[in-house]
């Protein structure tokens, strides 16, 4: 038998060495335990998780796992404990136990579940009943809370929600962000928590919503925003205008805007009679989104169409407001976390400071928004007046042609009536907006708005009266004009409907109490509404009537003045005024004065103590001295409730 190997000789010669049969079972146990431990550490770092981030995960009845900061692999609990990691406070305690060197201050549940392979729960057998699991780990975060920085890709929207009265988990806040994006037809790209209020509890969430893949969004604006609509050159936008008319009037002040004049629908190929008409009809062309729509709108008017520029400026103003509020909220959250150890009075002062900053910011944005609306309204009024003047010039040119062509006259009349209709629509929308915001102010301007609409109707009737100078043309176009007037009519009778947000007193509209329903405008037969209002007026000869109507139709007549509505809104500026027009205005003024006097008399009669006479009053000698003094005091306007029983005494 050969000599033994050196290793065998060493084992047999060393004193106190355990025999070989005892070492073999120990080695087998170690070899069996190694695959079991390796199965628990088999989970690899997810694609969305950093390899060195501190995290814990656990399922009820299985070994609790934690991430190794050096390798990024999941390791089992050293004490082989099985915990149900559901309570955030228990998760925080376990994180501090696993990572004592990191000074864990808070925990946050991940937004995505990760696969955990061969999670056998410490089974020593070679097989697992359920080897694969999906688990949502908890992140162990050291230090104070800092909101996560989110990337906003091109074409996406950055939004946030704060609810100071609700303290929800991060999972619930993440679901709210998903629901908010889904309600707008978008998908959630990323989210971050705001304003912590406990362990894994937050009062707000910020998130990024992006359009679904394959959705074209070249301008990078919000999906569904009206400013993203682009019209090819030469296209008709009358349909979009009609759709906007069908929508209900917006209630909030921020959403109020005045519809601008758009390109008219022209079915005929007859060229416009004036080159000025071509300059008025705006052409909406797609333009790239400006860097700052507010500055572009105020600084460089006319770069793009008025309606598109206003919508973009309003959207950019809201985006700027959201960015500023988000920055203030972040600073507030950081200051609140840093001031936890300060006295209560100091923390209260800090909160009041940030509240004042937010209030100042809101006031600045509100003033900018009001300035934006007023500028837009002023520009729209100017556009409406220019378009109306151009349409009236075209109508007069078509009538004065030799010989006048019925087709051109009808086309020019349609343009003119639509221009007047836009002014009526603008007046109605302005009144409805004021009624929704300030009912008292709307009550004060009711008479002015009603008078304005009446002036527009009179102006239209006088323009239609010019057709009587050509009886053959008037007879030929009478059916078409009647149909056109019926479709385009929008006068004071439209104010019968209650304005949005108005009180029950406004349900009567702007119609005076003694007025009847306005009938649709009809083609005049040699007379106007002023002639009908004063039947005692003698009828003028055709030449004088024609001169009067031409002077009234061209931008010269009806110098209606109002404190709420500028003169340019009611009638074109001019110099020539006929005597008949002045007489009509005087009659209207006298009627208005009579209504005011009657209203004052009715109000005075409604007083509880009757009218106070300031003339000579005959003293009844049968009255006592006290009653005579009471009469004298009441005559000078003094009303003392103490003496009321004397009046009621028989």
UniProtKB/Swiss-Prot annotation:
Disulfide bonds: 60-84, 95-140, 120-128, 156-210, 167-197, 181-209
Ranges where the record places region Collagen-binding: 442-459
UniProt site (Cleavage): 620-621
Stretch list, region Interaction with DAB1: 632-649
Keyword Membrane: yes
Residue spans crossing the bilayer: 581-603
Annotated binding of Cu(2+) 2, by residue: 561
UniProt-annotated binding residues for Zn(2+) 1: 206, 209-210
PROSITE patterns registered for this protein in UniProt: APP_CUBD, APP_E1, APP_E2, APP_INTRA
Region (GFLD subdomain): 50-146
Task of the protein: May play a role in postsynaptic function. The C-terminal gamma-secretase processed fragment, ALID1, activates transcription activation through APBB1 (Fe65) binding. Couples to JIP signal transduction through C-terminal binding. May interact with cellular G-protein signaling pathways. Can regulate neurite outgrowth through binding to components of the extracellular matrix such as heparin and collagen I.
PANTHER family (UniProt xref): ALZHEIMER'S DISEASE BETA-AMYLOID RELATED, AMYLOID BETA PRECURSOR LIKE PROTEIN 1
Protein name from the UniProt record: Amyloid beta precursor like protein 1
Source species of the chain: Homo sapiens (Human)
Lineage: Eukaryota, Metazoa, Chordata, Craniata, Vertebrata
């Amino acid at each position: 038998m050969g000599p033994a190997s050196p290793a065998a000789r060493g084992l047999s010669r060393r004193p106190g060495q355990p025999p070989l049969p005892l070492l073999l079972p120990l080695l087998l146990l170690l070899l069996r335990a190694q695959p079991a431990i390796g199965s628990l550490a088999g989970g690899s770092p997810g694609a969305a998780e950093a390899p060195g981030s501190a995290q814990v995960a656990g399922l009820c009845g299985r070994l609790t796992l934690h991430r190794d900061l050096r390798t990024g692999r999941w390791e089992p609990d050293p004490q082989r404990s099985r915990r149900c990691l559901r309570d955030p406070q228990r998760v925080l305690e376990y994180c501090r136990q696993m990572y004592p060197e990191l000074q864990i201050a808070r925990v946050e549940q991940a937004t995505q579940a990760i696969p955990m392979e061969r999670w056998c729960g410490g089974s020593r057998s070679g097989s697992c009943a359920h080897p694969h699991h999906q688990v949502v780990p908890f992140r162990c975060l050291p230090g104070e809370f800092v909101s996560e920085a989110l990337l906003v890709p091109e074409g996406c929207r950055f939004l946030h929600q704060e609810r100071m009265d609700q303290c929800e988990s991060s999972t619930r806040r993440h679901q709210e962000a998903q629901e908010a994006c889904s309600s707008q037809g978008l998908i959630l790209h990323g989210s971050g928590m705001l304003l912590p209020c406990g362990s894994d509890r937050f009062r707000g969430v910020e998130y990024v919503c992006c359009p679904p893949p394959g959705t074209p969004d070249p301008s990078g604006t919000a999906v569904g925003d009206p400013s993203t609509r682009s019209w090819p050159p030469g296209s008709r936008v009358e349909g979009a205008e009609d759709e906007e008319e069908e929508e209900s009037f917006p209630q909030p002040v921020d959403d109020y805007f005045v519809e601008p004049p758009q390109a008219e629908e022209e079915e005929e190929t007859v060229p416009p009679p004036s080159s000025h008409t071509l300059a008025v009809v705006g052409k909406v062309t797609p333009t790239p989104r400006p860097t700052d729509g507010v500055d572009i709108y105020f600084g460089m008017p006319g770069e793009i169409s008025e309606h598109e520029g206003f919508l973009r400026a309003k959207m950019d103003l809201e985006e700027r407001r959201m960015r500023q509020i988000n920055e203030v909220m972040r600073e507030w959250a950081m200051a609140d976390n840093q001031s936890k150890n300060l006295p209560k009075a100091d923390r209260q002062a800090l909160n009041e400071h940030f509240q004042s900053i937010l209030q100042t910011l809101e006031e600045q944005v509100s003033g900018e928004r009001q300035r934006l609306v007023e500028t837009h309204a002023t520009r729209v009024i100017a556009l409406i007046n220019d378009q109306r003047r151009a349409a009236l010039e075209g109508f007069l040119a078509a009538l004065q042609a030799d010989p006048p062509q019925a087709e051109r006259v009808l086309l020019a009349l349609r343009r003119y009536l639509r221009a007047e209709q836009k002014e009526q629509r603008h007046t109605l929308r302005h009144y409805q907006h004021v009624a929704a915001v300030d009912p008292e102010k709307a009550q004060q301007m009711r008479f002015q708005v009603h008078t304005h609409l009446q002036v527009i109707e009179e102006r239209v009737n006088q323009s239609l009266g010019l057709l009587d100078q050509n009886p053959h043309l008037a007879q030929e176009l009478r059916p078409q004009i009647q149909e056109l007037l019926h479709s385009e009519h929008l006068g004071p009778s439209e104010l019968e409907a209650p304005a949005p947000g108005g009180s029950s007193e406004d349900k009567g509209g702007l119609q005076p109490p003694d007025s009847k329903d306005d009938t649709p405008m009809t083609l005049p037969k040699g007379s106007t509404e002023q002639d009908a209002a004063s039947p005692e007026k003698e009828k003028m000869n055709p030449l004088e009537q024609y001169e009067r109507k031409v002077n009234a139709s061209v931008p010269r007549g009806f110098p209606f003045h109002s404190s709420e509505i500028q003169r340019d809104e009611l009638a074109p500026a001019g110099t020539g005024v006929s005597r008949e027009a002045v007489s009509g205005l005087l009659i209207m003024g006298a009627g208005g004065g009579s209504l005011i006097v009657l209203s004052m008399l009715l109000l005075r009669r409604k007083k509880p103590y009757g009218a106070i006479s300031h003339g000579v009053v005959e003293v009844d000698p049968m009255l006592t001295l006290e009653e005579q003094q009471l009469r004298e005091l009441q005559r000078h306007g003094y009303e003392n409730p103490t003496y009321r029983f004397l009046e009621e005494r028989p």
